[in-house]
């Protein structure tokens, strides 16, 4: 049995190495086509804003630095390589987080789960044919700011979890500083995650304060202070994006006007995108009793992000940008990494002749296959004749 497991682990490592190389090659090609404006994306607009000194995030400074080195063509190539390296960094940080969530899942299979999560897309249903835009699909290659922030989000969640689990004693200074810096960088690239994460963290701190009758108030205050730099970055982003100077007009946040038809469409959209995560969470997630608090915090953050996407919107020149969607979209690969990791954990547990467990595993694998088919199709299309993201 041990020899069989060792061989399976070796095969998994070899497959992961090949798949990682293929993904990096494909991503670099996609990013270059976008940077050079061969296929439609948000990147040319980001470049134009950055070169015009309309700064609204770290990506603006990165663009100006790369374009200032050796001109436009070098900048386009360099940015595509930086984005590709960022994808690899995001895979690594998400692997660390998944190992924290599911420590009994072997490292090779955790890496495979993260890779497959980057290939998943929403299921296609009759009458609901969209695959990329207008759906819950987190592999949003057309927007660089969410790609950069998404790579740091696993560090935010991991370091916060370590601080939260240390709150009964002295908080580790290096972990506290690392969390504050990571959350600041995430927010400077894209503030959407902070808007979803901060309310959950505040609720946890208030709940703990009441539960312990203020016995851990010092640690709770210190943990709350770690959010202040990112809160300042959020305020700066708000002033840059919503002030009249940015586009000659104003934009505001309001509650969305909900209709039964729109709510029905939204429910179908999220179900299409979350079939496997919902299935894995309710079949296997409840069995991970030792990780219940960790998984529960992440589920709460994702639920708040989805609620913000449903109930909040913008007016003015940003009315149709869908910027409150980015919070839950930036968590997409983390959601699917956890879902696939739970599916692998289901396969790790001996069935002992239990036909129901084998059936549950087979259903999960079928759901995963459906997500993978769409994700691979979307990833394969850029560069083909007549291709445009918005044809989805």
What residues fall within each predicted segment?
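Short hydrophobic alpha-helices at membrane interfaces in multi-pass membrane enzymes
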Residues: 159-184
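Transmembrane helical bundles and short interhelical boundary loops of multi-pass, membrane-embedded
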Residues: 231-234, 239-392
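Membrane-interface micro-motifs in multi-pass membrane enzymes
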Residues: 109-161, 269, 322-331
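Start-transfer (signal-anchor) and selected internal transmembrane alpha helices
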Residues: 1-27, 104-112
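Membrane-interface alpha helices of multi-pass inner-membrane proteins
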Residues: 175-191, 197, 202
